[in-house]
A protein has these predicted regions:
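Short acidic loop-to-helix transition motifs that present clustered carboxylates
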Residues: 32-35, 56, 189-192, 227-230, ...
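Local beta-strand N-terminus motif with an aromatic residue
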Residues: 46, 177, 197-198, 322-323
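Rossmann-like dinucleotide-binding cores of NAD(P)H-dependent redox enzymes
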Residues: 141-180, 252-299
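Short loop/edge segments at beta-strand edges and connector loops
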Residues: 170, 185-189, 223-225, 297-299, ...
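Short acidic, glycine/proline-rich loop/turn micro-motifs
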Residues: 1, 154-159, 213-215
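Flavin-dependent oxidoreductase catalytic cores
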Residues: 1-122, 126, 134-137, 142, ...
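Rossmann-like dinucleotide/flavin-binding elements
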Residues: 113-145, 150, 185-192, 196, ...
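Hydrophobic, well-ordered secondary-structure elements that form the walls
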Residues: 17, 40, 52, 177, ...
Length: 329
């Protein structure tokens, strides 16, 4: 099951079966954390815990749990990108978002550097954190520059409660950097900062694209990522999300859950969530239906006007009422 489904969703079944049989019963289904697994066993709901994806994310899951170091477990975030989608649905060899060495354990094994040096990493998002940690494990003296806060856009990605699993990934990556002695500098790196290092890794991330149409600079038009945080913008009423990729879809779902908003997705491609995982498609399509989110595909935005978003839909110009517009292009 994907991260949008509660963890341990099959435990009730294991508990019910255990009451009726005299043989050992296994509980399974999104049991990703040691404390949760222990809680199930201690409560008598099951005799054993069965897991699959967590062992792909970290094959030493059980060892680290047994030794009392759950903070060192690379967590399964139930994204299903590399395992279920790639393995089951596409028929390719599996990989893992949280474990880049999966399937390449020999080729990507971490060995001490032949010549340890001073390494700078620019950017404290997931790529920068992983690069800094890997360099530190190889024996380099690592300094990580981050102008905002460690985790980068993982903060926005994990803001919706239905994506809380990503918070585990962020906590793990930050913990490993701290444990392995990476020096963190909270500032934007400039050339003078980097000249003294033997090597520089650029992991500065990307900047969301805008919308090159008239009215895109209106006060009620903002980037979708500006809403996905604690102090983010919280408009109500008619909300239009321009862009039906994963970020746009998640933004629309989030606002449909927060209040009695009327939310609309406008996507220029023939379908929303193009290129996203099958699991995300299934879950979000269901949430879109349940929360009555309107979706326009093959729709080209022409302008953002005072009354709403003007778009070309089916060869005709149409005005979609909007009190606020979020860009997820």
């Amino acid at each position: 099951t994907p991260m949008q489904i509660p963890r341990g969703h099959n435990v009730w079944a294991a508990e019910a079966i255990k009451k009726e049989v005299s043989i050992p019963v296994f509980a399974t289904g999104s049991i990703t954390q040691p404390d949760f697994a222990e809680e199930i066993l201690a409560s008598g709901k099951a005799d054993f815990i069965s897991m699959g994806r967590p062992l792909l994310a970290d094959p030493y899951w059980a060892k680290k749990a047994m030794e009392g170091h759950p903070e060192d477990i690379s967590p399964c975030i139930r994204c299903n990108e590399g395992c279920l989608d790639r393995g089951n649905h596409i028929g390719k060899s599996i990989n893992c978002t949280m474990n880049p060495t999966l399937g390449f354990e020999d080729a990507l094994a971490i060995h001490p550097a032949e010549k340890p040096g001073k390494i700078a990493v620019v950017g404290g998002g997931p790529a920068g954190l992983k690069a800094a940690d890997t360099a530190a494990l190889r024996g380099h003296e690592v300094t990580l520059f981050e102008k905002r806060c460690l985790g980068g856009y993982l903060h926005e990605a994990s803001f919706p409660e239905f994506k809380a699993d990503i918070r585990d990934a962020m906590k793990y990556l930050i913990t490993q950097v701290e444990k392995h002695g990476v020096k963190v500098v909270k500032k934007e790196a400039v050339l003078e900062d980097l000249e003294k290092f033997d090597g520089v890794i650029i992991a500065a991330g990307s900047v969301p694209a805008g919308l090159p149409v008239p009215g895109a600079d209106r006060e009620n038009v903002t980037l979708a990522v500006d809403a996905l945080k604690e102090d983010g913008i919280r408009p109500t009423g008619n909300i239009v999300v321009v862009g039906g990729g994963l970020i746009g879809t998640e933004t629309a779902v989030q606002f449909s859950l927060e209040s009695a908003n009327h939310v609309t997705i406008v996507e220029m491609l023939p379908e929303i969530m193009r290129g996203c995982s099958d699991c995300d498609h299934i879950v979000y399509q269901d949430m879109i239906r349940k929360n009555h989110i309107a979706v326009y595909t093959s729709a080209r935005v022409l302008a953002v006007e005072e009354e709403g978003v003007a778009a070309e839909i089916g060869g005709c110009r149409r005005l979609i009422p909007a009190d606020h517009v979020f860009l997820a292009t």
